[in-house]
Amino acid sequence: MTDLSAQKRLAADVLDVGKNRVWFNPERQGDIADAITREDVRELVDEGAIQAKDKKGNSRGRARERQKKRAYGHQKGAGSRKGKAGARQNSKEDWESRIRAQRTKLRELRDEGTLSSSQYRDLYDKAGGGEFDSVADLERYIDANHGDA
């Protein structure tokens, strides 16, 4: 067996890959052994006698499976958590989404005539002050206190 380490080094440089990624066609070993210049190696690369193997990457298959399960709420228990609650769910973003939903609901009720503009303003201010935990809580309050409206 011929020592092709010099050719492998040249080929790695020509192909701009590491030596381990250089592939020699076993049927063309004689031609490869005769290649002593970079130009010779370039010609063999063009002919396909020398090629660069594909780079190996990390499979995302397991990560995709885990993502799919988490979309259903699985694998999210206490044993899977690393950060604090505030790092996993930003409290400001949580507040923003809740208050936007409540204000949208209030606007709908005002526009369809269920609430007068003064009731709307009163409830809007209460919502902004954090009186209601959710849209459902807001609706319960409206039913209890503005049921006649």
UniProtKB/Swiss-Prot annotation:
<protein>
    <recommendedName>
        <fullName>Large ribosomal subunit protein eL19</fullName>
    </recommendedName>
</protein>
<keyword id="KW-0694">RNA-binding</keyword>
<dbReference type="InterPro" id="IPR015972">
    <property type="entry name" value="Ribosomal_eL19_dom1"/>
</dbReference>
<feature type="compositionally biased region" description="Basic residues">
    <location>
        <begin position="58"/>
        <end position="85"/>
    </location>
</feature>
<dbReference type="InterPro" id="IPR035970">
    <property type="entry name" value="60S_ribosomal_eL19_sf"/>
</dbReference>
<keyword id="KW-0699">rRNA-binding</keyword>
<feature type="region of interest" description="Disordered">
    <location>
        <begin position="45"/>
        <end position="130"/>
    </location>
</feature>
<dbReference type="Pfam" id="PF01280">
    <property type="entry name" value="Ribosomal_L19e"/>
</dbReference>
<dbReference type="GO" id="GO:0003735">
    <property type="term" value="F:structural constituent of ribosome"/>
</dbReference>
<dbReference type="Pfam" id="PF25476">
    <property type="entry name" value="Ribosomal_L19e_C"/>
</dbReference>
<keyword id="KW-0687">Ribonucleoprotein</keyword>
<dbReference type="GO" id="GO:0022625">
    <property type="term" value="C:cytosolic large ribosomal subunit"/>
</dbReference>
<feature type="compositionally biased region" description="Basic and acidic residues">
    <location>
        <begin position="90"/>
        <end position="113"/>
    </location>
</feature>
<dbReference type="GO" id="GO:0006412">
    <property type="term" value="P:translation"/>
</dbReference>
<dbReference type="InterPro" id="IPR039547">
    <property type="entry name" value="Ribosomal_eL19"/>
</dbReference>
<comment type="function">
    <text>Binds to the 23S rRNA. Located at the polypeptide exit tunnel on the outside of the subunit.</text>
</comment>
<dbReference type="InterPro" id="IPR015974">
    <property type="entry name" value="Ribosomal_eL19_dom3"/>
</dbReference>
<dbReference type="InterPro" id="IPR000196">
    <property type="entry name" value="Ribosomal_eL19_dom"/>
</dbReference>
<keyword id="KW-0689">Ribosomal protein</keyword>
<dbReference type="GO" id="GO:0070180">
    <property type="term" value="F:large ribosomal subunit rRNA binding"/>
</dbReference>
<dbReference type="InterPro" id="IPR033936">
    <property type="entry name" value="Ribosomal_eL19_arc"/>
</dbReference>
<comment type="subunit">
    <text>Part of the 50S ribosomal subunit.</text>
</comment>
<dbReference type="InterPro" id="IPR015973">
    <property type="entry name" value="Ribosomal_eL19_dom2"/>
</dbReference>
<dbReference type="InterPro" id="IPR023638">
    <property type="entry name" value="Ribosomal_eL19_CS"/>
</dbReference>
<comment type="similarity">
    <text>Belongs to the eukaryotic ribosomal protein eL19 family.</text>
</comment>
